[in-house]
A protein has these predicted regions:
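Membrane-embedded alpha-helical bundles that constitute the cytochrome b-like, heme-associated redox core
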Residues: 1-188
């Protein structure tokens, strides 16, 4: 499998970014739910610290992934030729929405922590600077925005997964296979 993208399939690096981010987003969901269920104390703060570290990791991987995608422009697999105009529009809207959320979610979480005067560290190794000053009202705004963005991420992710499954099982094309490390093209 090629490191770089081709017209037929995503390269191994694009796949690694995609699936690593998927795993980290699932981890975020678990960590956020764990933190919600815990009373204020050391366990909750430790869980939130891990949540922030994973969020920063997603932000970094999203930046690398976007850079890789841009550097491969012209080599990325095209959408299936038989897509209708509205399907193309929805595919682009979904992908752009996912990229936007991969940046907006971690950044609003970072701003929320900054406004609450809580540090954002990378697994305790080093501390990131505050993005905004301590401000209770701003903290509440960023918290609401962060939660709204999570809902948007959930909806767009479900649409993305359902579209991939639709292409695989109904359209019987290679849309899903070209993002799977073990996916082979269907016989013509």
């Amino acid at each position: 499998m090629s490191l770089r993208n081709t017209q037929e399939r995503w390269g191994s690096l694009a796949m690694a970014f995609h699936w690593a981010i998927v795993i980290l987003i699932l981890t975020q969901f678990v960590l956020a739910n764990m933190a919600e269920s815990l009373p204020l104390g050391m366990a909750k703060l430790a869980t939130l610290a891990r949540h922030k570290s994973v969020g920063i990791t997603i932000l970094g991987l999203a930046a690398l992934r976007l850079g890789w995608r841009i550097s491969n422009r012209g080599h990325n697999p095209p959408l299936p030729a038989d897509l209708k105009g509205y399907e193309r529009f929805l595919a682009h809207l979904t992908h752009e929405g996912l990229y936007l959320l991969l940046f907006a979610m971690p950044l609003t979480g970072w701003m929320m922590s900054s406004a609450a005067n809580y540090p954002v560290t990378f697994f305790g190794w080093f501390r990131f600077p505050a993005l905004v000053g301590a401000n209770k009202e701003l903290h509440e705004v960023y918290e609401e925005v962060h939660e709204f963005l999570f809902s948007a991420l959930l909806v767009i992710t479900v649409v993305h997964v359902l579209a991939a499954l639709y292409h695989h099982f109904i359209q019987k094309d290679d849309t899903l296979r070209r993002m799977l490390p073990f996916g082979r093209r269907r016989a013509a």
